[in-house]
Amino acid sequence: MMIASSLAVLYGIAIVSSMGVQSARADYADDCTTPDGDQGQCMPFSSCRTIEERLTEAQKAGQKVPADYASYLQKALCGEFNGVRHFCCPSANIQHNSKVMSLFKDENFDCGNFLSQRVSNGYEVKLSSRPWMALLRYQQFGESRFLCGGAMISERYILTAAHCVHGLQNDLYEIRLGEHRISTEEDCRQQGRKKKCAPPVVNVGIEKHLIHEKYDARHIMHDIALLKLNRSVPFQKHIKPICLPITDELKEKAEQISTYFVTGWGTTENGSSSDVLLQANVPLQPRSACSQAYRRAVPLSQLCVGGGDLQDSCKGDSGGPLQAPAQYLGEYAPKMVEFGIVSQGVVTCGQISLPGLYTNVGEYVQWITDTMASNGL
């Protein structure tokens, strides 16, 4: 019997006793107390090492879950989100979903490959050199417009900001991939006497809008979302995923990089400011700089970046990637990694020279992998 089938039987038991105070109040990743009295978080079973291992052992042995452990799980049940039952998992046992991590670590998963170039602020990037860039298209007041950006992270998922999706699910209907110059049907560059052109752009619909459960628009917290495409988009020369900071080493590196890149068409709630894909350098700032600028504490879930040059932030897309090259899973050549997401309050072109707050992607890899696993790869 498959683990999922065994769990289905177990869940039937657990539902009866899941009306406790903890299960009634818990949300994804909420703090909770395990039946053993340990501090934990409300997580899907596949993200809890001890629970997954125990159930896997039972499955391999062809046994039912022991009655005492079934009772433990009944008490640990803390909620159901996206059709998946969650359990209070000890903090030390929380793990990234193994299926999604296998996808990201597969040797054929060609993420973060980029063409290097010397970049001055506001310069056009080379054709197809940032193949993960995505444009989000909205239908508003009878007009179709690109109002946000994002980054491709798999054949079915785009990573963007929650503020680009929240309250706009009925307007946001399509993703464009493989774009360079918006106004031209075909994107080409002259190389000597030869003209090299990129394949056509791909426009694809959206199956699911997945916003972080704790997104707080007022305080710009947990500003992260996933868009599940309505079909897989095969990787091509001009359409490939960016890498994510999926290891502790990469997560820590976010605080060590001195200069990041923002890439985009300057797409914001007011439209696009550039017809062609641009890139600019933005410096990492201490969180104290943003604390002073925004008069509040800046948590680890956000990065403080930019300031100085008034035009720096104009090149990025709202919801687009804050990126930098880094060593990825032991590979020799650096890969481009998305360390941050352009959040609200960042794209303030020509206004006061303030650093911006970016969503720290490394703090949300758990959420990304859990959400992808719950909604289908």
From Swiss-Prot:
Residues linked to a glycan: 230, 270
Gene Ontology annotations for the cellular component aspect, listed alphabetically: extracellular region; extracellular space
SUPFAM superfamilies: Trypsin-like serine proteases (SSF50494)
Ranges for domain Clip: 31-89
Record PROSITE patterns: CLIP, TRYPSIN_DOM, TRYPSIN_HIS, TRYPSIN_SER
Residues of the Peptidase S1 domain: 119-373
Transmembrane segments: none
Localization: Secreted
Record: residues binding Ca(2+): 179, 181, 184, 187
GO terms for MF: calcium ion binding; serine hydrolase activity; serine-type endopeptidase activity
Active-site positions on this chain: 163, 223, 318
Biological process according to GO: defense response to fungus; defense response to Gram-positive bacterium; innate immune response; positive regulation of antibacterial peptide biosynthetic process; positive regulation of antifungal peptide production; proteolysis; Toll receptor ligand protein activation cascade
Disulfide bonds: 32-88, 42-78, 48-89, 111-243, 148-164, 188-197, 290-304, 314-349
Pfam families reported for this sequence: CLIP (PF12032), Trypsin (PF00089)
Keyword annotations of the record: Calcium, Disulfide bond, Glycoprotein, Hydrolase, Immunity, Innate immunity, Metal-binding, Protease, Secreted, Serine protease, Signal, Zymogen
Disruption phenotype: Results in increased susceptibility to fungal or Gram-positive bacterial infection and failure to induce the expression of the Toll pathway-activated antifungal peptide Drs. siRNA-mediated knockdown results in increased susceptibility to Gram-positive bacterial infection and severe reduction in the expression of the antifungal peptide Drs. In a protease psh mutant background, complete loss of Drs induction and increased susceptibility to Gram-positive bacterial infection.
Main location: secreted
Keyword flag Kinase: no
Processing and modification events after translation: Proteolytically cleaved by a tryspin-like protease which is likely to activate grass.
SMART domains with a match to the protein in the record: CLIP, Tryp_SPc
CDD domains: Tryp_SPc (cd00190)
Function of the protein: Endopeptidase. Plays a key role in innate immunity by activating the Toll pathway in response to fungal and Gram-positive bacterial infections, presumably downstream of pattern-recognition receptors (PRR), such as PGRP-SA, GNBP1 and GNBP3, and upstream of spz processing enzyme SPE.
Entry comment, domain topic: The clip domain consists of 35-55 residues which are 'knitted' together usually by 3 conserved disulfide bonds forming a clip-like compact structure.
Protein name from the UniProt record: Serine protease grass
Organism: Drosophila melanogaster (Fruit fly)
Primary gene name: grass
